[in-house]
Curated annotation (Swiss-Prot):
Pfam family, one: AGTRAP
SMART domains (alphabetical): AGTRAP
Membrane-crossing segments per the record: 29-49, 56-76, 96-116
UniProt keyword annotations, A-Z: Membrane, Transmembrane, Transmembrane helix
Chief location category: membrane
Keyword Transmembrane: yes
InterPro entries according to UniProt: AGTRAP
Parts of the chain on the Extracellular side: 1-28, 77-95
Membrane topology, as annotated: Multi-pass membrane protein
Name of the featured protein: Type-1 angiotensin II receptor-associated protein-like
């Protein structure tokens, strides 16, 4: 099964837009915006250097880490911010902002999946095997090197030394 072609620019732009929408109202700490914008800067680095394995790997690891930090920050700050904005004039804006933050969090694992495949296309060497899901390249067209024919020219072979 072939994966759909997903542009790295589209992934970075989507996460940037969702991060901006999530930070529209001041209900999350500055760590949320700082972490996500820093990771998106790594995404811009991965766009700028198309052949860099390090850039795409750092972006992938950063997205994985922001999944954890987003879960932690939402768990710590959501209920208090919801109670504070429940009867105020910013209730709808809080709902929109928190919805965009949650949507960004839900979209990050899919983005990580596409980032991993881009990493493998650029020459990355990490394999992931989850039992029923195997992420690897099809190498059936490669010739095996285990059964190579011996060279025909063995006259130039050096004699073995005895010590």
């Amino acid at each position: 099964m072939e994966l759909p072609a997903v542009n790295l620019k589209a992934i970075v732009f989507t996460h940037w837009l969702l991060t901006v929408f999530a930070c529209m109202i001041d209900w999350l700490p500055k760590a949320y915006g700082l972490a996500n914008i820093t990771i998106l800067a790594m995404g811009v680095w991965a766009i700028a250097q198309r052949d860099s394995i390090d850039a795409i790997f750092m972006f992938l690891i950063g997205l994985l880490l922001t999944i954890l930090t987003d879960i932690l920050l939402f768990a710590l700050y959501f209920t208090e911010a919801e109670k504070a904005s429940e009867s105020g004039p910013l209730r709808d804006l809080f709902r929109f902002s928190s919805g965009m933050g949650i949507f960004s969090l839900l979209l990050k694992p899919l983005s990580c999946f596409f980032m991993y495949h881009m990493y493998r296309e650029r020459g990355g060497e990490y394999f992931v095997n989850l039992g029923f899901i195997t992420l690897s390249r099809d190498r059936s067209s490669y010739q095996s090197i285990e059964h190579m024919d011996p060279p025909a020219d063995q006259d130039n072979k050096l004699p073995s030394r005895t010590y």
